[in-house]
């Protein structure tokens, strides 16, 4: 049996950095990544056979817990009939109809294979429909790794301390205006100066890629009003929050309706599915109806769609989100209480099945505030919890995720470990 260290050494010889997505490399926390061999419910097991309570959840998709039997069965049954057709299927129509039925802002939807594809195409669609070039995004919000969006971004870029990517020519981002999240005044000023040139505003309505940051009161409604007034397209990037924090995402909780929405993660149930959709008059600009081109060999893949359909059915059951939210809140509150009892500067927040942990005196509301949190304290906390079998994201700038299988016993075990760790941090 290979150890995690042996596997990482082997991986580094064939894969850049030893990983296929940067944050997995443990670079911001130090140490050796855990190579996961299997997962079930709220647990993962590494290459050395050690079991962990998992709060990464594949970075959001595992809302039902890992390897849910009904999702696995759906994938197996679909795979028997063929892995990919490159042609329309009834299942993809059913998934599209299900998404439209659940999100009031969706009138039509196009399936893709990732969140990056969804956001990249939504931006292209907004530009094509409006005939404008400039876009507004926000510091610390991550919308995938397309060139025009890799400016002061969150997720792995923020984790490694360089929120803008090398290899992106300045002219590619010349039309990208990057503003402070939760600051409506700067958005108003940008529209006052460039209103006739702005194609869209794209925002994580609850930011989950600079840890977890909720929108300030009136921020999303203000974006809606400004976009409507200036004829710009409002895009909610709900790749992470869509069906993760509630049955209608952030737009359901706030009542703010975007023009376009991007989705991924939960809607694929752990398989590669993304989507973008919204107003029908905008969606008619997409090929083959209009001149905005988008295509994908594996878009609407039948096996991935089967996983998505099974997941969407299960999360639609009565009481699902009430239970999920209660467990997530219990975790966040329990961590906060134990840190306070130990005298450790620490805050926690939660919404739906997402939570944020911050080594600071208050819950941050912006990129600047989350960047000021104590990352060294987080590193010590992360490794001490990992030693005790609790698997959090290996970054101080990523949200955490609770699944439907994180029951009271799992939460209690996590809080017991945290109580021990906070005592060592105080010392």
Swiss-Prot record:
The record, for InterPro entries, names: 4pyrrol_synth_GluAld_NH2Trfase, Aminotrans_3, Aminotrans_3_PPA_site, PyrdxlP-dep_Trfase, PyrdxlP-dep_Trfase_major, PyrdxlP-dep_Trfase_small
Give the top-rank taxon of the lineage listed in the UniProt record for this protein: Bacteria
What molecular functions are annotated in GO for this chain? glutamate-1-semialdehyde 2,1-aminomutase activity; pyridoxal phosphate binding; transaminase activity
GO BP: protoporphyrinogen IX biosynthetic process
Q: Which reaction does it catalyse?
A: (S)-4-amino-5-oxopentanoate = 5-aminolevulinate
Q: Its principal location?
A: cytoplasm
Q: Which HAMAP family match?
A: HemL_aminotrans_3
Q: What is this protein called?
A: Glutamate-1-semialdehyde 2,1-aminomutase
Provenance organism: Bordetella pertussis (strain Tohama I / ATCC BAA-589 / NCTC 13251)
**Organism taxonomic ancestry:** Bacteria, Pseudomonadati, Pseudomonadota, Betaproteobacteria, Burkholderiales
